[in-house]
Amino acid sequence: MSYSPTLSSGFTAGRNSNRFISPPSGMCSFCSEDCNGTCEIALAAVLGARTVYPITTGNNQIASEKDYPLDYSHFNINGRVFGAEGTDKGLEELTVFDVKLNTEYGSKNKIQMNLPIILPALIKLNWRDYFGGAAMSGVSCVIGEDARNNDPNLVMNNGKITEFPLLQEIMDSYYPYHRGFGQLILQCNADDNFVGVPEIAIKKYGYKAIEIKFGQGAKGVQPLKRLKNLEMAIEKQAMGCLVHPDPSDPKIKEAYENGACPSFYSCGRFPVWTEENIKIHIEDLREMGAENIYFKMAGYDEADLERVLRMACANEIDMVTFDGAGGGSGYSPSKMMNEWSYPTIMLEQKVVQICKQIKKEGLLLPAITITGGFASEDQVFKALALGEGYITSVGLCRAAMAAAMTGQKIGAQIKEGKIPPIFQAFGKTVEEIYSDLPDLCAIYGKQALDFSTGAIGVFSYLHKIGFGVQHFGALNRKFDVSLFHTEDLIPLTLEAEKLMPLK
């Protein structure tokens, strides 16, 4: 049995020409010279190296297609009929609504959230409603790396950013709905640091939280982007980007003019952190005015996982997000999305084991988020339970953006009188059909009726996630999210049982 996809994919546009497949290679078992060329090999034969990355990126998001042999579906959720933990209420008074989902984190500056949910780094598609919906839901959310590349009004002088109006636009999409729960966080990679993104974000635009990026589950290296011509290569280099080959080299210019120059690529810088230089960087961020510092880490080698956690402990980092394989991205190498990193469930187990060792040493651990392929409340509950109290929140990125996009699109259809058939039984207007609008009105008053339906979509989706988690908490007679544990899970396979702690 092969766990990897064939040479067909939803995001490479490749298609095997028939249904008979050779599992080891993913090729058609019968490969003919009469084939019109639709598979990934045919694409590579014509488009070459650019097919390392998806050729379909744009107004979409993409994710791993590998069918991993172990995931959260290998567990069922336990249930109990006796007792009640985490509440002072009498048993005869308790309902599902009594399960407390609110959490708090932060080493120096405490952040409260209404849900054990984080919306991880993103800065494409319907980002306004993604961030606005996060604020309405009372959860923290992260602006993705390289946001500067999305700002047509960006201004740079002497290699440093002096104007970054997109940062203000993002704040304006978040803070009108913010009511004291959650935080808006700006993720910065090595290139962002190089051109001064943290400095201008904190000093000019008033950002209070920075996430330092080590990596993400869909790509363990920074992306390479093909550039159309010499002019674009020179422009990117002037903005501080690494460009290959070097467009300022006279020999490269001459080769380009003669039509004999290889393709240009902008190359993201690798993070080069040590215990010493990251300490200085964090101190600098705090001196600038940052109140909370976060880490974003992928499923790298186990020694690297431990090293990052120890860096977090040593520098009083507020939260570390670990991103496993199986999630998605806006732009990552196709095979890297499928074929690298610990799958999220295995990454979570590794992180928990490391946390146990660090805790034995008496060190204070940061809050920890696990993300990578989560979309429903059963998955969120299982991740929190398997985290044994060390995992304090779950990241929902692609799913929350899907809610922002569909919430916006369906709202527009309703306003045009083109109600999708599935929703026609629920009413004729946005107010009638969007069922959680009364909950938003209870918070913001009737002005919520005028909110963007994309942001309402994110709020409604996260409301559903929280409500579903409350059901599973009540099912196990645990009325506080902090009490969820592995005893609340039933392993269905031997592989799943091996992930459970020894009793």
Question: What are these language model-derived features?
Answer:
Residues L101-E104, P152-D191, K415-L449:
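A structural-propensity feature for long, helix-poor, extended segments
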Residues E257-C441:
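Glycine-rich phosphate/ribose-binding loops and adjacent secondary-structure elements
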Residues A121, R128-A312:
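Active-site-facing alpha/beta catalytic cores
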Residues A134, V320, D480:
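Terminal peptide-recognition signature
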Residues A400-K503:
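Short histidine
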Residues S17-R50, E361, T406-G407, A412, ...:
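Cysteine-cluster motifs in flexible loop/terminal segments that predominantly coordinate metals
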Residues M1-L115, K124-A135, V139-S140, P152-R179, ...:
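Conserved, well-structured core domains of diverse proteins
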